[in-house]
Structures are given as structure tokens and as C-alpha cells.
């Protein structure tokens, strides 16, 4: 409980072999994207959020971004000072909204610009299915419990990582509880259960 706030939402995964579950809706600000067959995969091996080409294009348009906002690597960027003005991006899972602030889904590049942490899965679109890969951009915001035995994923808002000067207290607490704290580096294998808290 020291690692998250509120209650865990337990989401059944399907089919066995993937951390895949039903996604009800994606929302950017007040705009809702209704998904006929919404599916999400929690993927710690993916850095960004990857979505269907059509929906990601709609998201980019709602952020008033055009090709003029692309850098030399064909990535969408905005000045970091403008990011806070942008709307939240939310994923609705089993009736509960999991929002990301703009500062969560835009990533600083170190030169004053912030990179959009959502990209399209061009060439991977599946007809009739709205498939989203929720990588580190999403998982770094939410505490996750990977329950292999019961084929379910637990999600709750993660407690922010303490400042550097308080990290020793954090690690002492970790040792006493036996819970693992830190960034996910890989999906847990299907033969074991792993419990991870994010940043």
C-alpha cells in the first residue's frame, strides 16, 4: 500500500501468453474515441504508447499538431513550456479512467523541446481491432501487479518516487516489506508472478 494510492483495479488478461485486456475508451481532453473492439497490451518492453494509425492521427489533430511540428527524425515535438497547456490523455479500463497529464505523455529531449510519447503502429494495424500498446509512458505512472497465477493485472496510481535525498528511507521501507520498487525492464514470464511499482 506504500507504493500506490486508492484501490487496485484487477483486469483479467487474455489470451494466455500476453498481458492483453479489454480497453473501453481512449479520451484526449473532452474528445472521446469510441472503440468497437478496444484491446490493450501492457508492455514493459515498449518505451512509448503505440496506437492504431487512425486514432493516433485524431489525437495529434486534437493537439493542434501538424507536420510542421516534426523534428528531423520525423517525431512530433513541442516546446516544453507549451506542454502544460495541453489536455490529459486518458484510457478507460473496466469503467475506470487512467489519465496521463500532458507532462506524462510528452518527454523532455534536453534541448527545450518535448517529444510526443504516443506513436502510430503503422504497418501493424489489425482490421476491426483498436490495439494499443501501453509502454513505459503509461506504466511509469501506474503501479502494476503482474498476477500470473490468476491471469490478471492490477493497476493503481503509483506513489511518486521520493526526492534523491530521501531515497535511503525508500530503500529501507522496501527491504522491510519485501516489495520490489523500480522501473519495469521486462514483462514477467508466465511461470512466475512479479509485483512492480513504477517511478
What are these regions (language model features)?
Residues 1-199:
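Active-site or ligand-binding cleft "flap/edge" segments
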